[in-house]
């Protein structure tokens, strides 16, 4: 199944998307986390979802992949702008509504979209994500992850092999104990990322993201059926964040993946695809 590339215009912004499957099927929009392009929604993962009877769309957030990028170190948009980009993609595909599936930051964007535009959101699935709120009592990111990425400033970004090694290492440190780290596949995806990115360094602009604070504490207003998928060894958003999400969003369901990290490991694809598919289809049947 070869994905079809399509660029969506939103004012002076270009959003690069790819779609899999039959456009007549219910749409699933995949939203990746901070600093990562749509490449990290592995094409085979997308195909498996499409084979379940969905029209699957993945896209590059601003400052990643082939979408509009800005000079490194500058902030030109807010978190709410990224949430509105979700709607722009849906409008570009003439979708009145869609199932939203977000990884990490993508899961928070799904929450924002569900709060702001409830009529456009059929369901939300949040993978390795956290509640859109300032929950200082919840455990933070593992210091080892921060220490690893602090080395990015010393990296020779002109040396492609070193850059790929850095990207692979960044995913390795997020891997849980459930499965061995899939270095071969991760390296292939990193190579693809490097080849297709307009400006790789612009991904770090996501560290300047602000905006949407006025929506803190409103995730309990979400009416869309919500599914939470979270590993018990997540080093970015520890498992307590999943429990907080489940407690906050009414009638949400939690799929706990024991030993999984901040990742969508290939050996867990069947489990995750089944959970997303069942969640979306149950909602259609309920309606």
Range-by-range predicted roles:
Residues 144-217, 224, 244:
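Alpha/beta-hydrolase
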